[in-house]
Amino acid sequence: MSVQILIGDVRERLRSLPDGSVHCAVTSPPYFGLRDYGMPGQIGLEATPAAFVEVMVDVFREVRRVLRSDGTLWLNLGDSYAASRPYQVPSTKGGAKHGPAQGAGGKRSTVPEGLKPKDLIGIPWRVAFALQADGWYLRQDIIWSKPNPMPESVTDRCTKAHE
């Protein structure tokens, strides 16, 4: 058995793999609106949740192409909160992480249409249902329970201790 870890933009790296050549894909794509890696066209800084979901569906169509017929996909995808604030959030290039309600990329964050400020956006559910509609099997959700989660400064909801 061999393991190969591919590093780079998934949209480019997957194209180099032959059809049906992957036994198992394990991934944690950038979460929507939470981090700026300082790369043009990066995943996670789409203008809307719907645009992010569309990108994820496109990416996972390519994952499906390279997976063997008996292959499996393991996807870890966290959520984010709707926020609207009048100031610029600086880039996180270099590794600093935004808090869960902050926009990324030095852009003013806005509340996505149909949501209210502080709403949990439901990105993992939106992506899961979109992938299911695109032909993927949704077999199980597995909770990653974190006994020592990252502290948060929020006072109007519980600290997130799972993904």
Q: What feature does the model see in each segment?
A:
Residues 1-163:
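Core catalytic lobe of class I
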